[in-house]
Amino acid sequence: MPAENVVGEPGQGWTYAKFLLFHERTSIAGAPQLRRGLNGLVKRAEKIFHNDSPLSEDPFFKSKVAQIELDLSALEMTELRGLAAEREGKGPGAESSLLKIKGTELQQRLTSLALEAAGHEAIPFGGPYGFKDQEVSSSKAAQLTAAKYLNFRKVTIYGGT
């Protein structure tokens, strides 16, 4: 390889790779996106009614939200610990792998709960995969739920594995 094409210092490739993997895995965990998604789901659940009461008041739904909330808080704290260690000059540790695994599992649990909450309104209408020329009464968020659910099935196997 010509010297002008070398990036960084020769012999430091693995050090650079670990740095990149740490940040890739941390970003795939998606704690801020998970927080926004959970908050959005809870807000939408206030407008979804089942047996004349909002889904947000259903004890089973609340229990699932609480478990995701607890696991998300743990994920956020782990992310902050990893970033603090990096700031102190310590190399990336196992946190990045843990973040990637737990974060992607949380993404899948959240999209599963969102799909469950949206129910039949998650059936896609319009676009290349939906039913064309149908009147749609569900919200855009509900219509995107199935696509997000299906898309997030892949996150556990890409990036940093």
Give the positions of each predicted feature.
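Short basic/hydrophobic patches in alpha-helices and adjacent helix-turn junctions
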Residues: 67, 105, 116, 154-155
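C-terminal helix-coil-helix/basic helical segment that borders enzyme active sites and/or dimer interfaces
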Residues: 50, 59, 73-136
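Residue-level recognition of specific faces of alpha-helices
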Residues: 64, 95, 148-151
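Glycine-rich beta->alpha junctions and the first turn(s) of the following alpha-helix
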Residues: 1-75, 155
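Hydrophobic, well-ordered secondary-structure elements that form the walls
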Residues: 65, 103, 160
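Charged/polar, solvent-exposed surface patches and flexible loops
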Residues: 19, 43, 47, 84, ...
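Glycine-rich phosphate/cofactor-binding loops in nucleotide/flavin-utilizing enzymes
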Residues: 6, 11-31, 121-161
